Regions:
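Acidic/His- and Gly-rich active-site-bordering loop/insert found
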Residues: 1-104, 125, 306, 327
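Metal-dependent amide/peptide-bond hydrolase catalytic core
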Residues: 1-4, 21, 39, 51, ...
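Active-site metal-coordination/substrate-binding segment of hydrolases
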Residues: 71-134, 143, 351, 356-358, ...
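Short glycine-aspartate micro-motif
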Residues: 73-75, 101, 108, 160-164, ...
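Short beta-strand segments
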Residues: 77-78, 136-138, 162-166, 188-190, ...
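Acidic/histidine-rich catalytic neighborhood of metal-dependent amide-processing enzymes
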Residues: 109-178, 375
Length: 375
């Protein structure tokens, strides 16, 4: 390690990685929230923890706002939940190998939270930044931010800028200014059961009907337009000697803009049964609207690139990515938004997830300059 500061950053991040906080483990998320809250409070930030219900971890809010300061400020967004189940640390322990710090949730996105919060801790006193800074850490981003979305949008309504701690894109630590919108279709087919040997002709196979629907859905994929439709799970039938009466599938779709979103939603809602005497139950929604690179976001990027240069690295803009994040919500509200400002590394959602130790000081310096001077 190059310096004592890097050693301190590594030690802090390692301690956070020891707390497993998968999305479906509210107790673990609550423990992680308490760790983050204690760190923020010790720095002098105002901290609030809010319950989002028994099946979801708490929402964490930290700020350097002075009492009564209602000016639009900087909103930092992060999430404390991970995709890794409890017990992952046993097979993928926190460790350093060369320049890589491995551990579940390291890259996505506990190191990013640690860097941004450490920078904010240095300007915790009200008035130490040009704009007030609000830091919101949600417990359910990996599962769609269903419980926290309303709170994200509430804070974003009073934000001049939104900065998101999702990990930097691999191979250069690029930031993100455009993300596809994400949606989900739950399709249920109801047929008619019958004995598969004695009364086969009286049955109406839900699986047969679903096969037609799967082909129609997958055909909605249009790579030239940036649209993908993927039937992710499918289940149907009960026993082999009964014509299946029920079949269901769950479909993921990604769209680059609202025009494409409206087109896909319309086509899915207009799905019709191919066979006789079967029914379709269609439940489809756009979970995250597309994050489109606006002129305002481009201007913010140009400004922020100057802070990165002063911190010692080149901050490039990544192409539109197919994965969604909470940046989709703020961008859709018209808030200039930059994403992918977290730690540099690779391997999100895998057991090979890591961050690059040699980049930590530069990324921290970047956040320090950004929070102090952005106006």
């Amino acid at each position: 390690m190059s310096s004592s500061r890097t050693e301190q950053l590594v030690a802090g991040i390692q301690s956070w990685l020891q707390c497993e906080s998968p999305s479906n483990f509210p107790d673990g998320i609550a423990a992680m929230a308490r760790i983050i809250a204690d760190y923020a409070a010790a720095a002098g930030l105002t901290v609030e923890l809010s319950s989002l219900g028994p099946t979801t971890g708490p929402l964490l809010y930290a700020t350097n706002r002075a009492p009564g300061d209602t000016r639009p400020g900087i909103l930092i967004l992060a999430h404390m939940d991970t995709v890794h189940p409890v017990g992952t640390l046993l097979e993928n322990p926190v460790r350093i190998e060369g320049d890589r710090l491995y551990g579940p949730g390291s890259y996505d996105m506990k190191a990013g939270i640690y860097l941004a919060l450490t920078a904010l801790a240095g300007v915790a006193r009200p008035g130490a930044t040009q704009l007030p800074v609000d830091f919101l850490v949600v417990p359910d981003e990996e599962t769609g931010s269903h419980a926290s979305r309303v709170h994200i949008e509430r804070f974003a309504a009073n934000a001049k800028y939104a900065l998101v701690c999702e990990p930097a894109r691999p191979n250069g630590g690029k930031c993100v200014t455009a993300r596809k919108g994400t949606g989900m279709l739950n399709l249920n087919v109801k047929g008619r059961p019958a004995h598969a040997g004695m009364q086969h002709e009286k049955g109406r196979s839900a699986i047969r009907e679903m096969a037609h629907q799967v082909l129609a859905l997958e055909a909605m994929t249009d790579y030239e337009r940036g649209i993908t439709v993927s039937v992710g799970t499918i289940a149907g039938g009960t026993v082999t000697n009964t014509v299946p009466a029920l079949c269901r599938c769950v479909v993921d779709f990604r769209v680059p803009d609202m025009g494409a979103a409206e087109d896909v939603l319309r086509r899915m809602r207009e799905l019709c049964a191919v066979g006789p005497d079967v029914e379709l139950d269609i439940d489809v929604e756009l979970n995250r609207p597309p994050m489109v690179k606006t002129a305002e976001a481009a201007a913010l990027l140009a400004l922020v690139q100057g802070y990165a240069e002063r911190a010692g690295f080149l901050l490039e803009d990544a192409p539109m990515t197919g994965g969604g994040s909470d940046a989709n919500f703020t961008s859709a509200m018209g808030i200039p938004t930059l994403d992918g400002l977290g730690a540099d590394g690779d391997g999100a959602h895998t057991l090979n997830e890591y961050i690059l130790v040699s980049t930590l000081e530069q990324r921290l310096k970047f956040w320090e300059l950004l929070l102090k001077d952005l106006a």
